[in-house]
Amino acid sequence: MAQKHPGERGLYGAHHSGGASLRTLGPSVDPEIPSFSGLRDSAGTAPNGTRCLTEHSGPKHTQHPNPAHWLDPSHGPPGGPGPPRDAEDPDQSETSSEEESGVDQELSKENETGNQKDGNSFLSIPSACNCQGTPGIPEGPYSEGGNGSSSNFCHHCTSPALGEDELEEEYDDEESLKFPSDFSRVSSGKKPPSRRQRHRFPTKEDTREGGRRDPRSPGRHRLGRKRSQADKRKGLGLWGAEELCQLGQAGFWWLIELLVLVGEYVETCGHLIYACRQLKSSDLDLFRVWMGVWTGRLGGWAQVMFQFLSQGFYCGVGLFTRFLKLLGALLLLALALFLGFLQLGWRFLVGLGDRLGWRDKATWLFSWLDSPALQRCLTLLRDSRPWQRLVRIVQWGWLELPWVKQNINRQGNAPVASGRYCQPEEEVARLLTMAGVPEDELNPFHVLGVEATASDVELKKAYRQLAVMVHPDKNHHPRAEEAFKVLRAAWDIVSNAEKRKEYEMKRMAENELSRSVNEFLSKLQDDLKEAMNTMMCSRCQGKHRRFEMDREPKSARYCAECNRLHPAEEGDFWAESSMLGLKITYFALMDGKVYDITEWAGCQRVGISPDTHRVPYHISFGSRIPGTRGRQRATPDAPPADLQDFLSRIFQVPPGQMPNGNFFAAPQPAPGAAAASKPNSTVPKGEAKPKRRKKVRRPFQR
């Protein structure tokens, strides 16, 4: 920034719209003494040779101060000197301060002369620079305090001992307590007298060796003043009152707006009610028509939207199915290519192996792996101490191997000799389940977790492993002692030769008995199945098989005349045809079930017309009472003949000695009439049946 002449620029600190301004009135004889207008200023000469300029405002104020301008922290004090500008050079500012000091001297002389002519007397306040203050002058709008008062504090007399930090802090305190001049005025209209300022006298350190102070630019430091605590409390009280006033005003306007809004809603509701009262019957018809029109429109829009969505859905489903087909085709193609590559690679490897002779080597390798020598070496390695220690380390969990962990998870409760890895708590719980078993019935091999064919070495190894896990000194389980007693009892049995031999003989006897009982029960089961599914034949004195059919008694017989199924009764015997009449099948209702007895009917040589409406024959299962004719039902107390035959075979009783020894016992024919006789079990209906002598029941032989 180029340096300007004092006559070409205004004094710093003058407001752009105020009445106090410094300007030149044209060329003068002395360039250092410019002319002034609009202010009554006074200048005095200090003992150190500097001049002080004191500015006084006019008696009338044409414009009130703007509080917003004072509250803005970006603006400096209106009447005081501001901080140095960033673009100015310190040397230039120092030169300008020297020039302005000369101007201040001239101004002070002229203002003193003018003030004496006006007849105004001012109270002078001595200062370090002998400049006379004017506390009685009304406070102007551009004073430092922001309350319209002019300052008697000369910026030339400011002690340089006040550092930049201290001055800035004082200025910040003043800025926070600035209020509009309206609050500081007295209610009577009189202007309050200005307070007497305390000036800080320079110290010895502040002066130079020649006795003069270090000239500093008045614009380099902001002017600061100290205020009393009472003024601060007063400012804070006024500031709180102003905020409370603004808050009350805002609440009042909010209440007014709320009342207006409620009134508008009430007015709208009244108009609506009044409009509803003036409705006519024709309006309802018009409303119905209007609703119908809009319903039709909405229905049309819904139909269009539904069609659009359905078409989109169908298109999406079609695209998705096509995509799935394409994906499946690509996967099949990739699978085919992969299999083709595998086949080609395998053929290439086989051909390469044939050329290099790898096939013979592979055959030799597999044969060597299957050789007895290698198996013997593996067995010796498995029985060696290093291998056993390694297995023990793995069992205790000191060496965690992934394949061993999988083996543990898979085997679970496998025997210890086959590689079972269990926790001590699991072993204690397993042994406690056998604590209530008597010692005579205890299975020592099951307790030790080994097979019954285990050797003495395997038994001792299993006992040691379990003893380490369940011993009360090693395991802190509350019932570890009971588990160890069970283990000790099992070890006493297998460790003593006599006890072990006795246990093995007892086990062999139990096994033999159980085997014989199992054989008997299996044979009995087979005989019962055979007895339940066979029928006695009086012609061949044998048995024929019968097959249970999946038919209900209510719909058992097929009738060709009615083309439907008829119900059947107990003992009914009928025939049905199949395969265009080429195959005849015989059925009977016995024990509430329908059976296929074609084999028995073929042996009896029974001829029955198939698919008839009436039942042609009836089977009798019990003895007839003399003097009765017609159908005979089996008595519920009479046992079946096949079960009697089965019992007779068990107790070795001939069938002829038992009553009702067969199903259909034929009567004893007379001599010479054997050829003409027929089995009485298949006597046609309506014919007289020969009477049979009642047999005496005999008890079973025991």
UniProtKB/Swiss-Prot annotation:
The alphabetized list of GO BP terms reads: protein transport
- Which Gene3D superfamilies does its entry note? DnaJ domain
Q: Transmembrane segments in this chain: where?
A: 250-270, 300-320, 326-346
Q: Where is the composition biased (Basic residues)?
A: 192-201, 218-227, 690-702
Which InterPro entries does the protein's record reference? DnaJ_domain, J_dom_sf, Jiv, Viral_replicn-host_int_reg
Annotated localization: Endoplasmic reticulum membrane
According to the UniProt entry, which residue ranges have a biased composition of type Polar residues? 113-133
Basic and acidic residues bias locations: 202-217
Residue ranges annotated as compositionally biased, kind Low complexity, are 659-676
Superkingdom is Eukaryota
Recorded hits in CDD domains, A to Z, give: DnaJ
State any single GO MF term: dopamine receptor binding
- Ranges of compositional bias, category Acidic residues: 88-103, 165-175
Q: For the J domain, which residue ranges apply?
A: 443-507
Chain residue ranges for the region called Disordered: 1-148, 165-229, 658-702
Expression (tissue specificity)? Highly expressed in pancreas and selectively expressed in brain, lung, liver, skeletal muscle and kidney.
GO-annotated cellular components: endoplasmic reticulum membrane; membrane
Key word Chaperone present in the record?
yes
* Keywords annotated in UniProt: Chaperone, Endoplasmic reticulum, Membrane, Protein transport, Transmembrane, Transmembrane helix, Transport
Q: What are the Pro residues biased-composition ranges? A: 75-84
Q: What is its main location?
A: endoplasmic reticulum
Topology class, membrane: Multi-pass membrane protein
Key word Cell cycle present in the record?
no
| Protein role | Regulates the export of target proteins, such as DRD1, from the endoplasmic reticulum to the cell surface.
> What's the subunit arrangement here?
Interacts with the FxxxFxxxF motif of DRD1 via its C-terminal domain.
This chain belongs to which protein, by name?
DnaJ homolog subfamily C member 14
Species per Swiss-Prot/TrEMBL record: Homo sapiens
Biological classification of the source: Eukaryota, Metazoa, Chordata, Craniata, Vertebrata
Gene symbol of the encoding locus: DNAJC14
